[in-house]
Amino acid sequence: MMQSITSKALVLYNRNFREDDKLVKIFTEQAGKRMFFVKHATNSKLSPVIQPLTLANLLMKVNDDGLSYIQDYQDVQPFTRINSDLFIMAYATYVAALADASIPDSQPDAALFAFLTKTLELMEEGLDHEILTNIFEVQILSRFGVSLNFHECVFCHRTGLPFDFSFKFSGVLCPDHYREDDRRCHLHPNIPFLLDQFQAVEYSTLETISLKAEIKQQLREFIDQIYDDYVGIHLKSKKFIDSLGDWGSILKDKENKESI
């Protein structure tokens, strides 16, 4: 069944189909994620609006049983800053892929759509893309059926203490209950504290974020552990982010040599 709708929409990715056509995966606010067919994409009037990480209002023919079609568009927002920086673009691509993996196609999820687009808008504004990604990863866990409490000890329910995380109990332990899990994570107390903050933070109150490099690295490693143990997905875009550390080191070495 085909129906015409107008909706705010974000392009997740596109891929070549046949000689000059494209299949475009788009997350729409009203109709969820859909695959669109664009004929003669290179010279199509739709070319500006089918590029990855492009936000626009689309007039669409949505098909519940097959490919959908874009009829017209307006208010294109291309995220220029993101697309001009390899590192930011990698993180933006990853959060988009994570959103794609978190819900079935054709399932409307206006809250997730708003969360994803706001994450990209804050990256575009220049807020720390790594920390924004961490916040996104933590808050989207519920879409994968994962609920973790970083706020209170799983045994005594006290708050505001130097917690450590236990995979055995899927929650945090206070110092009095560290003994309950010999294989607890031995995290820096700032890590559970920050994850508790990330779970609760609202973007409307977020003006600036800044963390030391070693804390950011520990956050990255621990969130990776959470996704490995509880979610079990392995996205190509995440593997690319992991490889960026090597590229960053190469670029820094080159800059240091040129400055000597």
UniProtKB/Swiss-Prot annotation:
Signal peptide: none annotated. Keywords: DNA damage, DNA recombination, DNA repair. This is DNA repair protein RecO. GO terms for cellular component: bacterial nucleoid. One of its GO terms (biological process) is double-strand break repair. The gene is recO. Involved in DNA repair and RecF pathway recombination. Belongs to the RecO family. It holds the Pfam family RecO_C.
